[in-house]
């Protein structure tokens, strides 16, 4: 096909290649930093290569043209392929989890289809079931290997979502048969949005109210077979497809209604609650909160998903912004690159800094989750109340961190995807840019596994309660929230950070000089300012409004607290990781700038009013100025900083973001290869309707000349 070549001086390919060659650090070293170490980086590259080379897992531009049914069929084929990988990865299931996280970069619906089974179905059994029950379902029955048992997660109902305690499905114990009878008592109790239920799953972990001898013991979990070995529905089970959604059409979300479905009594998960054959209830109430520990894994994974998705789309937008030229200075024959406009820098580079901050926090949060889960298991087995207390404290801290980070990260990445789309102008609206499907697929992350507003307000409430305990000196907090102990050192009127970098809090573990970008702005002291703002806001929040104010009345402020806590977590972990690098590392200086840009841009864009209100800073002027300065400092290295993610074109899967930078040829070829205009001599299937419209007869002809002067004259009455 004939192509008109771009003017050489304005070739996107030449521009991107030139900036790539100007990278002043080793992108492999930066990749190792982002992947949390050399070994992890090697594993990531190996898994990405395996995924890309697998012809069945292949995803390309045609992915954006698939119908819902085509997505479902293709996803089923890919699930079958993944089943072989999980057998090979065993017993190192963490490798398969990483594989699944990487697949989700380009095919999130596939990641979800398998993730619901491994991450929700099995985690619910692990969290609520005994060790014997977990071993039976996971290994004897084969669920851990995607064999024989394929599970779904039956929590959400048509009339209840976040309020788990209000679920209305019932599980009534029958003393005569030693069985539970599961029922959907009315339409509102229909299990809804159940991923995999419509066509795939043959078992479901059902959250239902335990009824024994007429008494309601609250919501417990039960394994309910819903299809037989021939994949036919069991009697009493009604299932349907909930239909089209905004995105993730490859997931067969369904509804489930259960009518007098009987299961053996041992199908109830009984780690914390048991029903004896005498209808006696044995509960361990102090430990029941531990059951939700395993379910926090979904939120932790979504922070990793946020990092990966941010990597992909900030890369596309920044490559496009280097290759695309628009307008230009007077008396210049060459147009300016988009990235050279200060506004464009301010639109995109803070999101690049966010991506880097997400990298470290996602890995650290995953490690914390694994550690907490291990401690919970050990404490549960030992029945040592001292260890149990420590485990519960660790779980609370994990809940706060995961709730804050999941909600904040998924919100921010939704904003990132759309801002990157807008930054690519009209071409960003093309499906082949990748932005449209990605956004529609992504935004559900703000709702499932805990609605973001509810999660964030709950995390904010926990912060308020912890601050209250610290103020009363009831407890000393350890871990990431230990800064709350500084409440007694905070002068309510003193400025936490100003032009002289005065601070009321100290952090001796971090080299303050290293992270001072200039005389006005010091990243470490901005950390102190964030801590001070959280403490001051957290102390004041419970007292907002009248004495009769409820927690709901101050929910908006609790959400802000959660966001601040998430930003603090990301910034602290990024700074501590940078501190570990040697001064000779060439990429260190750019990481310092990125950390400073993340801190200052977050304050300027999202929290300025709170920092001023609570005197964390005395002026926004130095913050605003330094954001612009940092954008300029980072700007020249944007290609190297995004190449450091080491995403091949397979994982980018965008006509606008290929590694070569040949934007226009790639885009043109993609459009023409997938939309051949030569079908039926260039005519569309609906061409006849358009042609008939264009060739239609004049109105008077279509009206049979009934309103013509000649006819009207004949019909006129004679006077």
From Swiss-Prot:
GO terms classed as biological process: fatty acid beta-oxidation using acyl-CoA oxidase; lipid homeostasis
Requisite cofactors: FAD
Matches recorded under Gene3D superfamilies: Acyl-CoA dehydrogenase/oxidase, N-terminal domain, Butyryl-CoA Dehydrogenase, subunit A, domain 2, Butyryl-CoA Dehydrogenase, subunit A, domain 3
InterPro entries (UniProt xref): ACOX_C_alpha1, Acyl-CoA_ox_N, Acyl-CoA_Oxase/DH_mid-dom, Acyl-CoA_Oxase/DH_mid-dom_sf, Acyl-CoA_oxidase, Acyl-CoA_oxidase_C, AcylCo_DH-like_C, AcylCoA_DH/ox_N_sf
Location relative to the cell: Peroxisome
Principal place of residence: other
Keywords of the record: FAD, Fatty acid metabolism, Flavoprotein, Lipid metabolism, Oxidoreductase, Peroxisome
Pathway field: Lipid metabolism; peroxisomal fatty acid beta-oxidation
Top-level division of the source organism's lineage: Eukaryota
Enzyme class label: oxidoreductase
Catalytic activity: a 2,3-saturated acyl-CoA + O2 = a (2E)-enoyl-CoA + H2O2
Enzyme Commission (EC) number: 1.3.3.6
Short motif Microbody targeting signal, span: 716-719
Recorded GO CC terms: peroxisome
Molecular-function GO term, any one: fatty acid binding
Family in the record: Belongs to the acyl-CoA oxidase family.
Official protein name in the record: Acyl-coenzyme A oxidase
Lineage: Eukaryota, Fungi, Dikarya, Ascomycota, Saccharomycotina
Gene symbol of the encoding locus: POX1
């Amino acid at each position: 096909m004939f192509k008109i070549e771009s003017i050489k001086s304005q070739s996107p390919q030449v521009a991107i290649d030139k900036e790539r060659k100007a990278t002043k650090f080793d992108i492999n070293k930066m990749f190792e930093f982002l992947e949390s170490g050399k070994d992890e980086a090697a594993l990531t590259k190996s898994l990405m290569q395996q995924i890309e080379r697998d012809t069945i897992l292949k995803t390309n531009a045609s992915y954006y043209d698939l119908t819902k049914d085509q997505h479902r069929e293709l996803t089923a084929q890919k699930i079958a392929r993944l089943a072989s990988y999980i057998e090979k990865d065993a017993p190192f299931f963490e490798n398969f989890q990483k594989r699944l996280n990487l697949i989700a970069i380009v095919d999130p619906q596939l990641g979800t289809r398998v993730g619901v089974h491994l991450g929700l179905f099995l985690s619910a059994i692990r969290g609520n079931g005994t060790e014997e029950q977990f071993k039976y379902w996971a290994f004897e029955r084969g669920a851990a290997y995607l064999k024989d048992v394929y599970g779904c997660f039956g929590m959400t109902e048509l009339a209840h979502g976040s309020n788990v305690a209000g679920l209305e499905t019932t599980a009534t114990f029958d003393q005569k048969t030693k069985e539970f009878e599961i029922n959907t008592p009315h339409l509102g109790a229909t299990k809804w949005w159940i991923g995999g239920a419509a066509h795939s799953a043959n078992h479901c972990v059902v959250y239902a109210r335990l009824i024994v001898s007429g008494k309601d013991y609250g919501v417990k979990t039960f394994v309910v077979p819903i299809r037989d070995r021939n994949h036919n529905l069991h009697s009493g089970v009604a299932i349907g497809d909930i239909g089209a959604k905004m995105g993730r059409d490859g997931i067969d979300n369904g509804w489930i209604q259960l009518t007098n479905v009987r299961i053996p009594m041992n199908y109830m998960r009984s780690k914390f609650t048991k029903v004896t054959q005498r209808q006696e209830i044995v509960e361990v109430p102090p430990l029941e909160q531990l059951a939700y520990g395993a379910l926090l894994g979904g939120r932790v994974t979504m922070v990793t998903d946020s990092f990966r998705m941010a990597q992909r789309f900030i890369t596309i937008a920044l490559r496009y912004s280097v290759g695309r030229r628009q307008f230009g200075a007077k008396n210049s024959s060459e147009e300016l690159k988009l990235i050279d406009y200060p506004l464009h820098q301010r639109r995109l580079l803070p999101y690049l800094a966010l991506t880097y901050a997400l990298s470290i926090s996602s890995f650290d949060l995953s490690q914390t989750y694994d550690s907490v889960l291990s401690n919970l298991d050990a404490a549960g087995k030992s029945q040592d109340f001292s260890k149990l207390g420590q485990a519960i404290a660790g779980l609370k801290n994990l809940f706060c961190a995961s709730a804050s980070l999941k909600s904040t990260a998924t919100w921010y990445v939704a904003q990132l995807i759309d801002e990157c789309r807008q930054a690519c102008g009209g071409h960003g609206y093309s499906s082949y840019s990748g932005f449209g499907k990605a956004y529609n697929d992504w935004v559900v992350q703000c709702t499932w596994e805990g609605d973001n507003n509810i999660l964030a307000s709950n995390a904010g409430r926990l912060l308020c309660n912890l601050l209250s305990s610290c103020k009363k000196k009831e407890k000393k907090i350890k871990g990431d929230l230990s800064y709350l102990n500084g409440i007694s050192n905070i002068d309510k009127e003193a400025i936490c950070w100003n032009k002289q970098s005065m601070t009321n809090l100290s952090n001796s573990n971090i080299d303050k000089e290293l992270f001072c970008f200039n005389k006005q702005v010091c990243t470490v002291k901005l950390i102190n300012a964030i801590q001070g703002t959280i403490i001051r806001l957290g102390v004041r929040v419970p007292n907002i409004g009248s004495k009769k104010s409820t927690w709901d009345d101050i929910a908006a402020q609790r959400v802000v607290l959660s966001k601040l806590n998430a930003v603090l977590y990301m910034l602290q972990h990024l700074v501590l990781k940078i501190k570990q690098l040697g001064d000779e590392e060439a990429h260190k200086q750019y990481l310092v700038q990125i950390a400073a840009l993340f801190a200052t841009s977050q304050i300027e864009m999202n929290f300025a009013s709170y920092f001023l209100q609570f005197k964390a800073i005395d002026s926004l002027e130095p913050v605003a100025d330094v954001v612009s300065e940092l954008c300029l400092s980072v700007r020249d290295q944007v290609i190297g900083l995004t190449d450091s993610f080491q995403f091949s074109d397979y994982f980018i899967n965008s006509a606008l973001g290929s590694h070569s930078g040949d934007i226009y040829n790639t885009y043109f070829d993609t459009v023409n290869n997938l939309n051949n205009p030569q079908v039926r001599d260039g005519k569309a299937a609906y061409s006849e309707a358009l042609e008939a419209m264009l060739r239609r007869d004049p109105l008077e002809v279509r009206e049979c000349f009934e309103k013509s002067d000649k006819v009207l004259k004949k019909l006129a009455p004679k006077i």
